[in-house]
Amino acid sequence: MAQRFRIWPQFRAVAIALTLGFALGTAALPALADETRTPHGDIAGTLRAGGIDAGLARLVSDLDAPGIAVAVVGPDGIVAEQRAGDLAGAPPTALRWGSLSKGITGSRVDALIASGDLRLADMLGAHVPDLPAGYSEITIRQLLTHTSGLSHDVALTDVDRPDTSAREVVPELPVHTPAVPHGSAYEYSSLNYLLLQAVVESVTGEPFGPPTGVPAHGCSLETENGSVPFFGMLMPAGQRCDAAGLGYGYFGGTFDELTDWAAWNLSARGRIFHAHSRAAATPTAADAPASDTRREAMYGFGWNYDTVDAGGRTWKRIHHSGAVPGAFTRIEILPDDNRAVVLMASAYGEPGSADLPESTQFLSSLLAGGQPVPDSGSAEGVGAPVYPIALGALSVLTAGAGVSLLLQVHGRPRRPVTALAVSATGSAAMLAGLILGIPAVTGLSVVQLGRWAPDIAVLAVASTALTVVSAFAALIRWGRIPAQPANASATSSRVRTRAGAASSGSDS
């Protein structure tokens, strides 16, 4: 009975650690479930009963972001809109537009092609000097359509360099060894559009900017930070701007300016641009060769092209999303309907938030007369379910690492060598996961993950640190345990028994 009480503090520590880990991993799940649920609700019925304004108001209410704005846009501007939170006040809030910047770059390149300064078949090396090996034979078309063979490596993009041109960054790029021949397969990579920005800078001899009449701004624009998810709550996102990355993700502006850009794409000028873009587009399906232009899903000059069935007919659709930590944008265009849906939100992080693009798709389908998609309770894509699962798993892992450390400090392992081996193996596995596993799965380093999903990054670092410290504690304890002969324990027990008997005899 006495020994049971001696080891009770260890079990109490274990229980406390597991309880904290369980609470940490599950406290945020109700909020996360709300975030990853498709917010369709009764939007379809509201829109049909009360019109576009009522439907937009319901959508904005259901999305429940710190700042959100959604609009239906025609060639002449906004037809209907609803704004809430940070995006409803004055003066207007400006945010970075993320990858919607690619369409602006595409229109800039298309204008240079129309003027004869560029050709789709031109090789990168003909316009940009100081290229590292492997880049010079990539064509302008391959860059525009993501068929260059370049991989999506955010270690080379999304850097805070507000005063640096793309031309200055190009010589610092790593040597490129394509896994497949240039032009043979689609692989989305923002690096393509950084290189296109360098092409425009070289051809024009001027700093990179949007085409005339397009209201987008570079790093001189002051933007709001926005928010990223943090254990079911929100925390401010870090502020940064990549002037070498305006072409792929760092143009910005207000919601009004974003709707103006959507209207530009419905104008006569925009329709000419999209005719060029669609004609040069490449299939995005992994199993489709780049030469197969019969596929519906295509990528052109910074835009996705496909079709959607709604109202008993098939509609052409042009769309793209944009995201930086703390901000999300999306434009969805139905050119045959002469309307577009535009959405901006001042909160975004990865993984998760898939309800934002899905809601825009849902709304555009309704406007075209389509039937609402049944609400399955989960958002489109892998981000939404992965986020709470990863958060819960890492919380339990962190608690387990804490338990291991407590046992090393306070416990009395009978097999110290085994405890040391287990701790060392766990430590090595956690370090490998932190250094190699996270980048392999997410494409982000731990530091970069901290911008998109700080709660995941915090738990990953904490669990690894606790495991490593536990291994060191096991090593220290193992080094302090003196070697004993096999019968040492029995001898010690007999000595204590005799000493106890002698003591009893002297007291009587």
Feature annotation, model-predicted:
Residues 1-36:
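Secretory targeting and sorting signals
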Residues 104-105:
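Active/ligand-binding-proximal structured segments within catalytic/core domains
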Residues 46-50, 94-99, 137, 185-190, ...:
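Short, solvent-exposed loop/helix junctions and linker helices
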Residues 38-47, 91-96, 127-131, 156-160, ...:
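Second-shell loop/turn segments in exported
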Residues 2, 34-73, 242-498, 504-508:
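Catalytic loop of the DD-peptidase/beta-lactamase superfamily, centered on the K-T-G motif
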Residues 44-98, 114, 118, 122:
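Short, conserved catalytic-motif segment at the N-terminal edge
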Residues 50, 91, 96-100, 112-155, ...:
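Active-site helix/loop module of the DD-peptidase/beta-lactamase fold
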Residues 154-259:
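Catalytic-site signature segments of enzymes, centered on catalytic residues
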